[in-house]
């Protein structure tokens, strides 16, 4: 079972003034550019953030920085050799940089994104080696302005995974940013408060080998052309 005390504290937070606020309030639009730049700097430095999506709060890092990805894998107890990893992209053109997208899949994604879906596609060699162990990558383009704006400003994908959760836990520790910060604040570099989050995961759609399969029905209902 996940124990938030087991992973080491974030190296980026060590030595900082305790008064330095690690819970940052953001809004759908008109955010302070300095606040956004602070997030980008953390990600570029290999740091981890917790942030809202159109489904649930997630842990994220720079999607091309392997050490940061490894930190998230340790926190989530993910074996990248056995589990698909997912990234958030800003738009469809950036998706095609990191995943192989044929015409049919492109039309399907264009019809359903942004939205609460994870599309499983074959990855390209632009992804770090840790992704290429399984040759597939989950693609997210959430209908959430905060997460997409971060991806746009970062000019790179965000490696993303939902928060660790145990069945007996109060759901507020998955949805309330202040409680999320209380539980996970010591093992990430910043928690972004985007309001109360959801509890329903994304719908996972596998689009490899010329087949389409709903692997997990979640919040999104897929509309085919």
Model-derived features: where do they sit?
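Ser/Thr/Pro/Gly-rich low-complexity, intrinsically disordered segments
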Residues: 7-10
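Glycine-biased, low-complexity coil/linker segments
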Residues: 13-15
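Active-site-adjacent structural elements in enzyme catalytic cores
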Residues: 21-225
């Amino acid at each position: 079972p996940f124990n938030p005390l087991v992973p080491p504290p974030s190296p980026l937070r060590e030595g900082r003034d305790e008064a330095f606020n690690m819970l940052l309030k953001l809004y759908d639009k008109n955010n302070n550019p300095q606040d956004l730049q602070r997030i980008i700097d953390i990600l570029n430095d290999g740091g981890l953030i917790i942030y809202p999506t159109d489904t649930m709060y997630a842990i994220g890092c720079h999607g091309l920085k392997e050490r940061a990805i490894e930190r998230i894998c340790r926190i989530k107890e993910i074996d990248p050799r056995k589990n698909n990893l997912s990234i958030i992209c800003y738009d469809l053109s950036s998706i095609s940089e990191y995943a192989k997208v044929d015409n049919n899949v492109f039309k399907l994604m264009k019809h359903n994104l942004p939205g609460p879906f994870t599309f499983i596609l074959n990855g390209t060699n632009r992804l770090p080696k840790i992704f290429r162990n399984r040759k597939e990558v989950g693609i997210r383009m959430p209908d959430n302005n905060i997460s997409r704006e971060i991806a746009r400003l970062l000019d790179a994908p965000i490696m993303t995974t939902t928060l660790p959760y145990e069945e007996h836990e109060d759901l507020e520790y998955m949805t309330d940013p202040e409680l999320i910060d209380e539980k996970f604040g010591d093992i990430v570099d910043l928690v972004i408060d985007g309001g109360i989050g959801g509890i329903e995961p994304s719908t996972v759609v596998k689009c490899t080998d010329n087949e389409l399969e709903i692997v997990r029905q979640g919040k999104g209902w897929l509309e085919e052309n």
